[in-house]
């Protein structure tokens, strides 16, 4: 279990490094003003950030997801696996329930982590910046708003993570079965990458409008007086001002991110397990990867 956990953490780091620039673009598109939009779309946002802030601008807020990575993987792996065993048998419904339980519990870390990430991603470059880093951001929020401020957006995070993790594990299980992902298959890695990437896309599509609301709530008040009184008020104001399309803002960037993030995660997990388990090689010298580790460790929504 410790080895699987280590491999999952390594895969998660790879996924964060690959996907964070897309996440920065997504957040900026989600929260920009409709009256005076700064970006015309995903590609324009990428170009503008690089031009104005260099490539490093795409990695603003990176420290927060990296810091929370180990704890999130520990929670997801432990809760999903134990829940599935407690339910007694492996079925599509139980895969969904186990994934949903894992998604709900990891919100304790995911919500503050994403709050800091969002604030840093929206912070202007230069000496006048408000936050020095992820820890400083959370410390300042706690100092001004207390524990409630650190957990801003918790309900919307729960509404996003709980069903999306359920959908992810359900989809991943169905795809790995359909593709015939078995230990010893020389096409195992490409199949896992395809299953993981596709599952990530499906899970994001299932709850993306909630993610838009969460981002707006967590960014609210950063550049002026707070606008929203809660989730329903945010939905109402956003829809009234911008129509239903507001709930798809940043979707292209998110879907572009979803597949490579999961591909990087699964490739890294497979490589780590292959080398680390060399002592467990079969009679022909081929390392036997642990198929169940992949779906339990990879999570598409937070990292």
Curated annotation (Swiss-Prot):
Q: Tell me, what's a Pfam family for it?
A: Mito_carr
PROSITE patterns named in the record: SOLCAR
Q: Which GO terms describe its cellular component?
A: mitochondrial inner membrane; mitochondrion
Instruction: Show the catalytic activity.
Output: L-lysine(out) + L-arginine(in) = L-lysine(in) + L-arginine(out); L-histidine(out) + L-arginine(in) = L-histidine(in) + L-arginine(out); L-ornithine(in) + L-arginine(out) = L-ornithine(out) + L-arginine(in); L-homoarginine(in) + L-arginine(out) = L-homoarginine(out) + L-arginine(in)
Tell me the InterPro entries matching this sequence: Mit_carrier (IPR002067), Mitochondrial_Carrier (IPR050567), Mitochondrial_sb/sol_carrier (IPR018108), Mt_carrier_dom_sf (IPR023395)
Q: What segments bear the compositional bias annotation Low complexity? A: 284-303
> Where would you find the membrane-spanning parts of this chain?
2-22, 61-81, 96-116, 153-172, 187-207, 255-275
SUPFAM superfamilies for this protein: Mitochondrial carrier
* Each Solcar repeat, start to end: 2-86, 90-178, 185-275
Q: Which UniProt keywords apply?
A: Amino-acid transport, Membrane, Mitochondrion, Mitochondrion inner membrane, Repeat, Transmembrane, Transmembrane helix, Transport
Outline the segment boundaries, as ranges, of region: Disordered. Answer: 282-303
User: GO biological process annotations for this chain's record?
Assistant: amino acid transport; L-arginine transmembrane transport; L-histidine transmembrane transport; L-lysine transmembrane transport; mitochondrial L-ornithine transmembrane transport; ornithine transport
Q: How does it sit in the bilayer? A: Multi-pass membrane protein
Per the record, the similarity remark reads: Belongs to the mitochondrial carrier (TC 2.A.29) family.
The task this protein performs is described as: Mitochondrial transporter of arginine, lysine, homoarginine, methylarginine and, to a much lesser extent, ornithine and histidine. Does not transport carnitine nor acylcarnitines. Functions by both counter-exchange and uniport mechanisms. Plays a physiological role in the import of basic amino acids into mitochondria for mitochondrial protein synthesis and amino acid degradation.
Q: What is this protein called?
A: Mitochondrial basic amino acids transporter
Q: What is the lineage of its organism?
A: Eukaryota, Metazoa, Chordata, Craniata, Vertebrata
**Gene name per UniProt:** SLC25A29
């Amino acid at each position: 279990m410790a080895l699987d956990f280590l491999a999952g953490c390594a895969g998660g780091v790879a996924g964060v490094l690959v996907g964070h620039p897309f996440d920065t673009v997504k957040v900026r598109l989600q929260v920009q003003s409709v009256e005076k939009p700064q970006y015309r779309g995903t590609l324009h946002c990428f170009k503008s950030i690089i031009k104005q802030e260099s490539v490093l601008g795409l990695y603003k807020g990176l420290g927060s997801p990296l810091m929370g990575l180990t704890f999130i993987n520990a929670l997801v792996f432990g809760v999903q696996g134990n829940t599935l065993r407690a339910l007694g048998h492996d079925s599509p419904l139980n895969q969904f329930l186990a994934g949903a339980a894992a998604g709900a519990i990891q919100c304790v870390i995911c919500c503050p982590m994403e709050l800091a990430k969002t604030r840093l991603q929206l912070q202007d470059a230069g000496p006048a910046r408000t936050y020095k880093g992820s820890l400083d951001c959370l410390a300042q929020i706690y100092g001004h708003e207390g524990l409630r401020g650190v957990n801003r957006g918790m309900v919307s995070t729960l509404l996003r993570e709980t069903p999306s993790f359920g959908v992810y594990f359900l989809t991943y299980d169905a795809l790995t079965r359909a593709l015939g992902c078995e230990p010893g298959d020389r096409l195992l890695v490409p199949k896992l990458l395809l299953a993981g990437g596709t599952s990530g896309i499906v899970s994001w599509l299932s709850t993306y409008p909630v993610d838009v609301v969460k981002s707006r709530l967590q960014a609210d008040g950063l550049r002026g007086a707070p606008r929203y009184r809660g989730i329903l008020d945010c939905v109402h104001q956003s829809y009234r001002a911008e129509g239903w399309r507001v709930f798809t803002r940043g979707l292209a960037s998110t879907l572009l991110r979803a597949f490579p993030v999961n591909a990087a995660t699964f490739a890294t997990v497979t490589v780590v397990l292959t080398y680390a388990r060399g002592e467990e090689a079969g009679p022909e010298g081929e390392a036997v990867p642990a198929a169940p580790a992949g779906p339990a460790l990879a999570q598409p929504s937070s990292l």
